[in-house]
Design a protein with these regions (language model features):
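Short hydrophobic signal-anchor/transmembrane segments that target glycosyltransferases
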Residues: 426-433, 589-603
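Alpha-helical solenoid repeat scaffolds of the TPR/TPR-like class and their adjacent stem/linker regions
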Residues: 1-575, 625, 629-632, 644-653, ...
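Glycosyltransferase donor-sugar binding loop
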Residues: 440-446, 606-621
Length: 763
């Protein structure tokens, strides 16, 4: 068929769009009874459209083709691929089954089915499907490779490695089998074995980039960043225009040197502009960049995401990056096209992307979502616990007869960081009569004065810039702690996974994460009477309930030298200024529309965003648009671009409006410390109650609303109450000091008392 050959030639020249248009026009010209050879035209049209990133269009073409060519295995297999891209997984599995039933030699469909089952972590079904594939196509290395991945998911490393070895024996040149074999060792912290596997693979495939990339991955996972950097630097000396080497060097050094890393990311996308993975990692790095003009980096990161989205569908781990950056810019119109709450969350959990679940909290809308995200955390936790079973550490026992309780605090944020704002009372007021305190940090930065101060206050401060998870757990276990608190979760440079190894007899999480982490190995989560969910099934851990407050405002983040202007903004300006300093990942269309409702109820009022993003053109555009769409004029929306030195801008706000469902925490405390009251919306889960706790423990519990309408009403009422706002501006700091939130010494006493009680009861 000459036309088809012409179209395939066009595609080979990079003109896939034009080729697809020609095929579509030819098919349409043949009417309802196309000739027999049109089957191939339908197939290639759907394939091209699918590769152009239009799975819905491909599915539509395939549905018409299946109506004409019944039980065609190629069309059915491609239909399964289209359904998979559309995340219609059950439908995809059905198409793959139909294709294999139609023709038992259609093992490509069976392989696609097995791969999808592995990706869905339906490991038992994947084993059955892979065994069928193995029988149908015994020389296909994909079958034992799928078996290896399925057994790996079941925590059976022995069988997983057996099947991976079988796969590489069947075809020593099969790159994916080698990569999966290497990743299995790496995931189970068997770094020496992983390096041996890499060396064997390189002998078989000395020029294969993906194997060399696996070598770099092993170095990084083993904490051998310098070895990885040196290897890549040598490679770039030999081939300075190697896009892959620039990209991998950026991946290796960006966490330590963001500016130098970005230069290599930029060079990688210049050399290979059609690689969406390169663009997404560059975007992610720009989004984290603090040097120079941060707003320029934020804007450039957003533009890099938009470029990546033009290059086709993104894998789920890159959807996570795209989602975070798009939410940051207020592009909720694009975010809703990326996938459902359930599908995305489970995909991220299955890929061990715990930090993605943190950002997912703000997308919760219903009770079903609350339990769903809890299950997503459990999925992540089960995977991490499974990794420890084949190379376990013995769980330490409580030491009896020791004079003092040995308390551990693990966080890479024991430095100038919001975590230390609230942790500092524990170091300022150590109960030395009863406790020895050990700290553990994996921070990659050199010690700042705050870290140096904390180190001077505790018995031991163990600081390691690069250490593997199991090694970190073993280091902690050797200290024979009685109880260990984890304060960082999955935020940058922290090692939540260490808690899966049971490094202490009793363990707890606090401060760094507003939800159960997901690990059954963590015994407690620190709460207070306000933050503790009314439904205990919304937590995985037992409640470690403080008598009054879960935090206190220490001297570090709440400096009396921060000046409060004596005259409230509305008296100076003639209008009410609402505002927020909350992170935009907590924003949603519902949050913005509720804030807009408040402005509509308070004539001439304005809204002030105090955020680093405020200097980015896209942020200003889409935040303003959200208010304009609700009937609020654009000139009522104000922006101040600032990082770090934002406290003075509370002098320009009359009232802070909180985010929901994930509320503020640090920002709520900062706002009221500056005399600016906060209106919050209280929900049922932990992350929906942070501000409720802070306000209640500051004597402002009446500012907590329990419905959207109540939120608007309380904001409007407070805007009208000039007398109260004037009083709070001058008196709120004193009021806080008389309440639990402002009493760090009492907080430290309550904390140490509760730890002592818990440890002594366990003994």
């Amino acid at each position: 068929m000459a036309l088809l050959e012409d179209c395939l030639a066009l595609e080979a020249k990079g003109q896939r769009n034009e080729a697809a248009r020609k095929l579509s026009r030819w098919i349409e010209s043949k009417g309802k009874k196309p000739p027999k050879e049109a089957r191939l035209a339908w197939y290639h049209l759907a394939r091209m459209v699918l590769q152009l990133g239009r799975p819905a269009d491909a599915a539509s073409h395939l549905a018409k083709a299946r109506g004409l060519y019944k039980k065609d295995p190629e069309l059915l297999n491609l239909s399964g691929i289209a359904s998979k891209r559309l995340r219609n997984f059950d439908e995809a599995l059905g198409f793959f089954d139909e294709a294999f039933k139609a023709e038992k030699t259609a093992t490509a469909a069976l392989a696609n089915k097995t791969l999808l089952l592995v990706e869905l972590r339906r490991s038992d079904d994947a084993v059955k499907s892979a065994l069928t594939l193995k029988e149908a196509d015994p020389q296909n290395p994909a079958a034992p490779r799928f078996l290896g991945n399925a057994y790996l998911q079941k925590g059976d490393l022995k069988n997983a490695l057996r099947f991976f070895d079988e796969a590489v024996q069947l075809n020593p040149k099969d790159v994916i089998s080698w990569i999966d074999r290497i990743k299995a060792d790496t995931d189970f912290e068997r770094h020496d074995e992983a390096i041996k596997a890499v060396e064997t693979a390189i002998r078989e495939l000395p020029t294969e980039h993906r194997i060399i990339e696996a070598r770099i991955m092993v170095y990084r996972r083993a904490g051998k960043f310098k070895e990885a950097e040196n290897f890549l630097a040598e490679r770039l000396q030999e081939a300075p225009d190697d896009a892959w080497a620039h990209f991998q060097l950026a991946e290796t050094i960006a966490r330590f040197d963001r500016e130098r890393g970005n230069k290599h990311y930029k060079r990688a996308v210049e050399l290979k502009p059609d690689d969406s993975v390169y663009w997404m990692n560059y975007a992610n790095s720009l989004d984290r960049s603090r040097y120079g003009n941060e707003a320029d980096h934020i804007q450039a990161g957003y533009e890099a995401v938009m470029k990546a989205l033009t290059l086709g569908p993104l894998p789920s781990r890159y959807v996570r990056m795209a989602r975070n950056i798009l939410v940051r810019m207020g592009r909720f119109d694009i975010v809703k096209t990326l996938g459902s709450f359930r599908d995305l969350g489970r995909a991220w959990a299955n890929e061990s992307l715990h930090d993605a679940l943190h950002y997912h909290l703000a997308r919760v809308e219903t009770d079903e979502d609350r339990y769903e995200i809890l299950e997503q955390h459990r999925i992540w936790g089960r995977i991490e616990l499974a990794k420890t079973k084949l190379n376990p550490l013995p769980k330490p026992a409580l030491v009896k007869g020791r004079d003092k309780i040995r308390l551990g605090i693990m966080s890479s944020d024991l430095r100038h960081h919001p975590v230390s704002y609230f942790a500092m009372p524990l170091f300022d007021f150590i109960d030395r009569n009863r406790f020895e305190v050990y700290c553990y940090s994996w921070c990659r930065h050199d010690p700042d004065p705050i870290q140096q101060y904390i180190a001077s206050r505790v018995n031991e401060f163990r600081w390691h810039k690069a250490i593997a998870d199991r090694d970190a757990a073993e280091l902690i276990a050797k200290d024979q702690l009685d109880m260990l608190f984890e304060l960082g979760s999955s935020t940058d440079m922290n090692k939540l996974e260490v808690m899966a190894w049971n490094p202490a007899p009793l363990t707890a999480s606090w401060l760094g994460y507003p939800h159960s982490a997901g690990l059954e190995s963590i015994d407690y989560i620190l709460v207070d009477p306000f933050i503790n969910p009314p439904d205990p099934t919304l937590l995985i851990e037992k409640s470690f309930e403080m008598p009054k407050s879960w935090v206190a405002m220490g001297r570090l983040g709440f400096n009396e030298a921060e000046e409060i202007k004596p005259v409230i903004p509305s008296a100076r300006k003639g209008y009410i200024t609402f505002g927020t300093a909350n992170n935009p990942y907590k924003y949603s269309p519902k949050v913005l529309s509720t804030w807009a409702r408040v402005l509509k109820e308070v004539p001439e009022s304005k809204f002030l965003f105090v955020r680093p993003e405020a200097g980015a053109a896209a942020f200003r555009e889409f935040m303003t648009k959200a208010f304009v769409d609700e009937g609020v004029a654009a000139d009522r929306i104000l922006f101040e671009a600032v990082r770090g030195k934002h406290m003075r801008f509370y002098n320009e706000m009359d009232i802070s409006l909180d985010t929901f469902p994930q509320t503020g925490g640090t920002t709520t405390c900062e706002s009221i410390f500056m005399g600016v009251p906060v209106i919050t919306l209280v929900g049922t889960a932990f992350f929906e109650r942070l501000s409720y706790s802070n306000l209640s423990n500051a004597g402002l519990g009446d500012l907590a609303a329990f419905s959207h309408d109540d939120f608007v009403k309380k904001a409007v009422t407070l805007a009208e109450d000039t007398k109260r706002r004037t009083y709070l501006r001058s008196a709120l700091r004193r009021q806080i000091k008389d309440r639990p939130l402002g009493q760090p010494e009492q907080f430290a006493k309550d904390f140490y008392d509760l730890v002592a009680k818990t440890v002594n009861e366990a003994r």
